[in-house]
């Protein structure tokens, strides 16, 4: 059995929807055990309320929150980790950064060496830092000793020119629009499923399971 966990942060639900699609793709692989977790929120509730995020976060309130006590089982215990984060100035969110910065003990034990790592993201605009967010995230995964997997061009949907779409060789992405009203398209969700399946198949081969 190959164990794959999806770890995400979402404020308005875009990354959550992508995470569910990634998980669905991973579950298509025979013998895959797939989990999905959200990272802890660091913003005060009054700030979230002003940002209009209280109601939207209820959409995925049923998803378990990854606590520090769970890091050993959920993160170090997985064969592959697929991370999802919105862009923040071309980087991951502070909420996701806080989780990764807390992995020093596991890093010191080489707990992630040889595991598969992959990333997906969202931004408000077509050129809102999607690629830089994934690439800068990759730097952390390399420091952890992980094997990077992206979204290869065998997934032809990323080359479509007839509609606005996210996605690059670095990983699948979605474009939320300046007001957040655009939800992930079927094309983007299909790419997310592809990436989830692709990562899981590679992790299964590496783990010899």
Curated annotation (Swiss-Prot):
Chain positions recorded as FMN binding sites: 10-15, 87-89, 122-128, 143
Domain Flavodoxin-like residues, every copy: 4-199
Source species, domain of life: Archaea
Keyword Cytoplasm: no
Residues that coordinate or bind NAD(+): 12
Residues that coordinate or bind substrate: 107
Residue pairs linked by disulfide bridges in the UniProt entry: none
A Pfam entry, by short name: FMN_red
Named cofactor requirement(s): FMN
Keywords: Flavoprotein, FMN, NAD, NADP, Nucleotide-binding, Oxidoreductase
Record GO terms (molecular function): flavin adenine dinucleotide binding; FMN binding; NAD binding; NAD(P)H dehydrogenase (quinone) activity; NADH:ubiquinone reductase (non-electrogenic) activity; NADP binding; NADPH dehydrogenase (quinone) activity
Similarity remark: Belongs to the WrbA family.
Annotated NCBIfam families: flav_wrbA, PRK03767.1
Name listed for the protein in its UniProt record: NAD(P)H dehydrogenase (quinone)
Lineage per the UniProt record: Archaea, Methanobacteriati, Methanobacteriota, Stenosarchaea group, Methanomicrobia
């Amino acid at each position: 059995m190959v164990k794959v966990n999806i770890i995400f942060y979402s404020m308005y639900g875009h990354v959550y929807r992508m995470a569910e699609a990634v998980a669905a793709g991973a579950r298509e692989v025979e013998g895959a055990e797939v989990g999905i977790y959200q990272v802890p929120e660091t913003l005060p509730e009054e700030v979230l309320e002003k940002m209009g995020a209280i109601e939207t976060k209820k959409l995925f309130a049923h998803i378990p929150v990854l606590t520090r006590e769970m890091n050993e089982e959920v993160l170090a215990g997985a064969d592959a980790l697929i991370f999802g984060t919105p862009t923040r100035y071309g980087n991951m969110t502070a909420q996701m950064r806080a989780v990764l910065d807390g992995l020093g003990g596991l890093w010191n034990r080489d707990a992630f060496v040889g595991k598969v790592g992959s990333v997906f993201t969202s931004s408000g605009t077509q050129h809102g830092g999607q690629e830089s967010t994934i690439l800068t995230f990759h730097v952390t995964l390399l420091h952890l000793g992980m094997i990077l997997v992206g979204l290869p061009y065998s997934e032809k949907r990323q080359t479509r020119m007839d509609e606005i779409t996210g996605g690059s060789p670095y990983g699948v992405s979605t474009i939320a629009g300046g007001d957040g009203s655009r939800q992930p398209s079927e094309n983007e969700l299909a790419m997310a499923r592809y990436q989830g399946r692709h990562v899981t198949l590679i992790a299964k081969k590496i783990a010899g399971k």
